[in-house]
Amino acid sequence: MKYQLDAREARVIGCMLEKQITTPDQYPMSLNSITTACNQKTNREPVTELSESEVQQTLDLLVKKHFLRTLSGFGNRVVKYEHRFCNSEFGDLKLSPAEVALVTTLLLRGPQTPGELRTRAARLYDFSDVGEAESTLDQLQQRDDGPFVVRLAREAGKRESRYRHLFSGEASDAAVLEEESVNDNSHPLAERVEALETEVAELKRQLAALLA
């Protein structure tokens, strides 16, 4: 895959995608506004404290990679940046509004479940239900020019698997294999739980008969 963003690059791109939707009157963005967005305390995982010089270095790298372009002159007192990451006349990556919302939220907060993504992406796109979020994740996984997301191993005690973006490289085989292993082993456990529930119900019935 041609997208190989490091952590800072992913944070910058995620912030610019987010602000383009939520505060379009303040987009394109200056170095100061991008730094503020990167270090935002809400909707960020992890929370960072990047300096302007660190963000500037990242912006310069993204410009060289053709993921950003600078806007200056014509009355602009400061250099501003706009992304060319997706849905740009300069790039090939075209994403639907729902796909943009999920990709943005994954770039900003790392691996998340479909339920978490639906809730956290609400300001970017109004998913009708979790099913629509899952369907969009499937589309991102199955695109001919992708995949752009992958389902990770289900964490112990969790009902949903998390998804992560692939714009920073492929997920480890171990994560996918662990997911498959969890699924393979889930049937015997489910059967055992069902048997125990049946046994408890029978004991309750017998106890009720004795007390009658």
UniProtKB/Swiss-Prot annotation:
A Pfam family per the record: DUF480
SUPFAM superfamilies named among the record's database cross-references: Winged helix' DNA-binding domain (SSF46785)
Disulfide bonds: none
HAMAP family: UPF0502
Native organism: Pectobacterium atrosepticum (strain SCRI 1043 / ATCC BAA-672) (Erwinia carotovora subsp. atroseptica)
Protein name in UniProt: UPF0502 protein ECA2523
PANTHER family in alphabetical order: UPF0502 PROTEIN YCEH
Assigned protein family: Belongs to the UPF0502 family.
Coiled-coil region: none
Gene3D superfamilies: Winged helix-like DNA-binding domain superfamily/Winged helix DNA-binding domain
